[in-house]
Amino acid sequence: MSLLTYNFESEYLNNNHQITVILPDKKRGISPAEFYGSDKKYKVLWLLHGTYGDDTDWLRKTNIELYAAEKNLVVVCPSALNSNYSNWPSAMLGYNMYDYFTKELMPLVYGWLPVSDKREDNFIAGLSMGGRGTIKFAVNYPQLFAAAAVLSAVPVPFDELRPGHPCLIMDTANPRMVQTIENAGGFEAYANSEENVWALIDQLAPTEDLPRLMFACGHED
């Protein structure tokens, strides 16, 4: 496989941003002109890292390059800091990762790389924080993805986030969840936003719009 590292100034993140992309290699017996001049559009996996990670995690810590080669698949790995793949308009000059993903990153990849924008050719997956981002994008933009794999993560349990509810996820050991709710303008605003995955799943479940979903969690997760 070929490896592309691309660093660019993002309008939605208000800083330079880096992505890592795995691309199919030219097969032996095919001329460079034939391969690189082809109009072929490849299927793509949007692969999201977890907390404390970046765009290199999947490449350094897994065999994703081998799996991509087997499937002749493009893999796009963005870097999201510890943003929970949410918009943070009050952070620095604004760090709007949720909007960035669909409004900037995806158009960039479709426009500059040999990647199909058809729903049936687009897949999304992520680990831990990346899993939460995965399910959030999958249910808010079901028209964009054929399937989603949520690894070591589940949608946030909203009833347990209500003020006064005894919930481990709201413990002071997990300040990100508290900050995320404050960032949204409080619990009610948070519950009525794109973050409320449970409500969206309920709306989509009776329809044929929901992407195929896979959830997986290991014994040590």
Where does each model-flagged region fall?
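Non-catalytic cap/lid and distal C-terminal segments of serine-dependent acyl enzymes
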Residues: 1-221
